[in-house]
Amino acid sequence: MKAILYIMLLIFVSCGGNNNSNFEKNRNEQTQKITNTVKTINELKIDLRKSMIDYIKTGDAEYGEKDVNECFFIIDNFLIDVKNSKSKKDGLSIVKNTVLQLNNINKKTNFSLIETMERENIAEIINLAGYEKGYNAKDEDITEQWREW
């Protein structure tokens, strides 16, 4: 009887250790996913700003640094708001509002601020932030239905 009890105790401790190990592994994977997403968003923002500023320097841009700063103000507010959102419905409302604001600034610059590369970067920033919150699939474009860029 003691042997059976000892074996059961040993199995219980062994299984408990595996669950903790699996829990810890899953937690580490989730933390890494968030860290990688944030890093990617920051890298995309750096590339986006560089592209916009570099085009101003060519002298062909129909927008200025003030417009670039306004664009980034919109994007940064989006990232804060979506991070603090509590539901998918709220998150998608934030996406819609952000895209409409970006449409307006792009229209104000004669549709020159957000070109192909900028469009890709902005959409990816928004989509990754939504994905991080679980509002969309990683390859789903949640901006498409509202954007004019």
Residue ranges and their predicted role:
Residues 1-7:
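Sec-dependent signal peptide recognition
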Residues 13-14:
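C-terminal motif of bacterial Sec signal peptides marking the signal peptidase cleavage site
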Residues 17-21:
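Signal peptide cleavage region of secreted peptide precursors
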Residues 24-81:
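Short terminal alpha-helical segments
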Residues 24-37, 109-149:
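Amphipathic alpha-helical binding modules
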Residues 60-63, 86-88, 113:
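Charged, low-complexity interaction regions
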Residues 72-108:
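Mature extracytoplasmic domains of secretory-pathway proteins
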